[in-house]
């Protein structure tokens, strides 16, 4: 019999819930999920599909073709095996909550602070786990690349887009 590992996930946004969703079938783990108190705005969560078990009904869009446009031109891409998917934050978190085994997971609505590379809860108790994953955004480098999309949601009365 193998011993259980402890995992702490910090950050209750889409990235934290994505990790929780990935860990749902792992045995012999105990998870403390620190989601914080901030519910966040209902923005969009985009990802490349690798898991076919995520239902299309939670998606806002799914594309097998896309292009990247820069000042220097455009580059077209296509992937039938790993389409780009977009859902809303609320749909994604709701899906992850419904499809996660709760018996080994503690969801904690408390903020976490970091002092001298150590992580503490609201009672100033140090968070100690075998693995700690912090999905909160930290702007530590000017050279960090963040993927953001600026655009509009367009709805038409007739289907005119080549999904």
Give the role of each language-model region.
Residues 22-73, 150, 154:
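N-terminal FAD cofactor-binding segment of flavoenzymes
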Residues 15, 39, 138:
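Conserved Rossmann-like nucleotide-cofactor binding loop
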Residues 103-163:
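Predominantly flavin-linked oxidoreductase catalytic cores and closely associated redox partners
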Residues 1-4, 25, 53, 60-62, ...:
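Flexible, charged surface loops at secondary-structure boundaries
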Residues 2-32:
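N-terminal Rossmann-like FAD-binding beta1-loop-alpha1 element of flavoenzymes
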Residues 49-110, 116-118:
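A conserved beta-strand/loop capping segment in the N-terminal third of enzymes
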Residues 22-26, 99, 135:
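Active-site catalytic microenvironments for nucleophilic, acid-base chemistry
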């Amino acid at each position: 019999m193998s011993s259980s590992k402890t995992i702490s996930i910090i950050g209750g946004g889409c990235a934290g819930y994505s990790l929780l969703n990935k860990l749902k079938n792992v045995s012999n783990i105990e998870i403390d999920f620190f989601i914080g108190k901030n519910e966040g705005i209902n923005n969009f969560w985009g990802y490349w599909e690798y898991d076919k078990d995520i239902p299309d009904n939670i998606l806002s869009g799914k594309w097998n073709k896309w292009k990247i446009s820069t000042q220097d031109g455009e580059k077209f891409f296509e992937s039938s095996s790993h389409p780009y998917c977009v859902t809303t934050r609320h749909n994604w978190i709701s899906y992850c909550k419904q499809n996660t085994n709760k018996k080994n997971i503690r969801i904690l609505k408390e903020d976490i602070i970091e002092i001298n590379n150590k992580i503490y809860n609201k009672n100033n108790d140090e968070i100690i786990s075998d693995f700690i994953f912090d999905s909160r955004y930290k702007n530590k480098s000017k050279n960090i690349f963040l993927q953001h999309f600026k655009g509009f949601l367009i709805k038409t009365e007739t289907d005119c887009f080549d999904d």
